[in-house]
Amino acid sequence: MKAVELKRLLDSMARLTMGQKADVLEALQAGGDDEEVRSIAESRLIQTPACPHCKGGWIVRNGSASGLQRYKCRVCQRTFNTLTATPLARLRMKAKWLQQQDVLSQGLSVNKAAAALDVAPTTSFRWRHRFLQLAQAVKANDLNGVVEADETFFLRSSKGQRPGRKPRKRGGRASREERGMDLMPILVVRDRSGATADFLLEAVSKACLSQALKARIHSDAILCTDGSAAMAAAAHELHLHHEPLNLSAGERVRGPWHIQNVNAYHSRLKSWIARFHGVATSYLENYLGWFRALDRAAKNQQKSAPMLALALGLAGHH
């Protein structure tokens, strides 16, 4: 815009009503958010300049579309943009993605998020799970020092499905006859620095526990548990230094050994997830990843969790 045109525009601002000024500010904010989203998205190819189709590294600019730079791979001759092969591919309204990051950081319900974003509830739900698709895999690796491990349980939910059983009343409990089938075990592993990993288990067995723990805990770590037979067997199989507590005898703490950190994490997780009034088991891993992202942000004193970066695969494992 030329200087004369800009001056004319600024002079006209004085004649705007308060409502019109608010509309102008909203438009300016949306433009700034759209530019920031594009900048974050484009940083993917700066970090890893590779074709999403063939992984070739010989790529060139090839015009633009929908406000995003397009590229062409000289190896496979296919075109793409920086969102191709990410969970956010083909999602519209990029100017609202930073707001979506904020509503995820606040843990808003689908309807409250839809109202905040001025979108339909179906759009809010779809955006939530697109943003969380990669977050579920971001877990701590190589936990070390004193590592606490314990299971907690969530009621299985077939929300949105037609299970082959009589439906429970909302907020129901597992039946005594089918208690083992109705409860989903979640193993949470957390070291004293706050690094956390969690796993949905098929069963609380040596095989399932060993499979979950073997790639996450450093060989020199000290594993502290509630002393269950399955956990003791898994620790023995993985050759880990194991410090079990005898909870049945009332032993909660023995010197530096306890599982209070991981149990406190269980409590915060269940309290937070209760706001959603029942999470379908098919989506539970997304919510676990969401809560881990919020927990990391709180630990690092971040104003909001980097949910957009997580959705694009830009955030590292913590």
What are the residue ranges of the model-derived segments?
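Residue-level recognition of single "structural anchor" positions
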Residues: M1-H318
